[in-house]
Amino acid sequence: LSKEKYITIVGAGPAGLTAAINLANAGFETTVYEQNQNAGLRFNGDFQGLENWSDEEDTLQILNRIGIKINFLCHPYSGNDGLFYGPKLEKVKVKTSRPLFYLIERGSDPNSLDQGLRKQAEELGVNILWGKNLESVDDSKAIVGTGPKAADAIAKGMVFRTSLDDIFIGFIDDKIAPKAYAYLLVNDGKATFATCMFEDFQNEKIYYERALRAVNTVIDIDINEPEEFGGFVNFFNEPKISKDNRILYVGENAGFQDALWGFGIKYAMLSGYYAAESIIHNQNYKKLCEINLLPKLKTSLANRWLFAHLYNPGYTFILNKLKTMDDVIPALKKHYNTSMSKKLVYQIAKHWYKTRLIDKQCMHENCDCVWCRHGKHAH
C-alpha cells in the first residue's frame, strides 16, 4: 500500500470508529489509537437516544447509508411508548408518524453501540491499539476524535434493574433540570434515569434528588441494583474542523454536538463518515462539514438560546402545543433545521454563549499535535 493508504485515527468513539469502518471498506489500512483498554469505558451501560426527528431520512437509513450495520441494541420508541411531564407534573402524550428516537446502550457490554462499532471495525481488519495515547502525528493525514474536553452541560443519573415495562418519560422543569430535562428510559428490564443541567452544576445532588422524587410521583417503579453515573457534553460556537485539511477533528472533540438537548451521537458518526469520505475521494473535509453539519449545529445553538429563555411557563406552553398535534415529527424537524429567523437568533446566541473549554496550546512552531488547535490552519 502507498503511504496515502495508511490512516491514523486517534480515539475509538463513535466518530473515530465510523471513520475507521468507512476507510477500511474503501481499502485503507487504518490504525486506531485509544487511550482506554476498551471501547465505551467512559459510560456505564446507560441508555441514550439516537434522535429521529431532525432529518427527512429515518436514522436507520442514515446509518445504513454511512456504512454502519445494526449489530447493537437499537430499539425504536414512538410517541405512544412514553410520556412527558411539565413543571406542574401535567401529563403530556405526543403522536408520531415514525419512531421519535432509537434507544441505544453505551459502554462496554456486548449490546452497546460502542462494542458494536468496535466489532464492525475489527471484522474489517482495522488495527485498534488499546491503552495507547498518541500525542502527535507525522505529515500524513490523521483523524482525531478524542471526546469532550470540558463540561458545557452535565448529567447525573443511575442505571438499575426494574420490572417496569418498556417506556420513556421526559421531564422539563428548571427546578429539577435547569435549562435542560430529566428522563427515564426502560428497556427489557434495564433502566436509565438521569437529570441534565446546563447551569448551576454545583447543586447537581439537589436537582438529582428532586428529579427522583418527580419520577416516583408519576410512576410506581422498583429500583434494583442501582449504580450511579455522571456525564458531560462539550460544544463550541464554531466547530474546530481541521488543521490544513490534514488533521481532521471529528465528534465532540470538534464540537459536533447538539447544543439544545445533547443528542449528538448522530452528528459524531456523520462527522466520522465525512472525514473518511474526504480522504477516500480527496475532498475538503471542512467544506463537507459546512454543507452537511454546520447549518444544524448553528441552529442548535440558536435553539439553546431560545430554550434557555423560555423558563417554566414557556415549557408548559410548548408541551401543551405539542400534545394537540397529530404528528410532532414535522414540527421538531422544522425546529432543528435552519431558517432565516434561526440565523438571526444564532447571531445573538454565539455572542451569548461561551464554551467552558480552555484551549491549551502547545508551543511547537510547526504544530503536528493532535490535542491542540493553534496555528493559522487550526480551523
Which residues does each predicted region cover?
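Beta1/beta-strand and adjacent pyrophosphate-binding region of the FAD-binding site
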Residues: 2-15
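Glycine-rich FAD pyrophosphate-binding loop
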Residues: 12, 24-46
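Predominantly flavin-linked oxidoreductase catalytic cores and closely associated redox partners
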Residues: 12, 22, 36, 108-228, ...
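A short, Lys/Arg-enriched amphipathic alpha-helix followed by its capping loop at the start of a domain
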Residues: 19-28, 62
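N-terminal FAD cofactor-binding segment of flavoenzymes
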Residues: 39-86, 156
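FAD/FMN-dependent oxidoreductases across multiple families
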Residues: 75-76, 203-289
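Active-site-proximal substrate-binding core of FAD-dependent oxidoreductases
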Residues: 261, 277-317
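C-terminal auxiliary extensions adjacent to catalytic cores
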Residues: 312-379
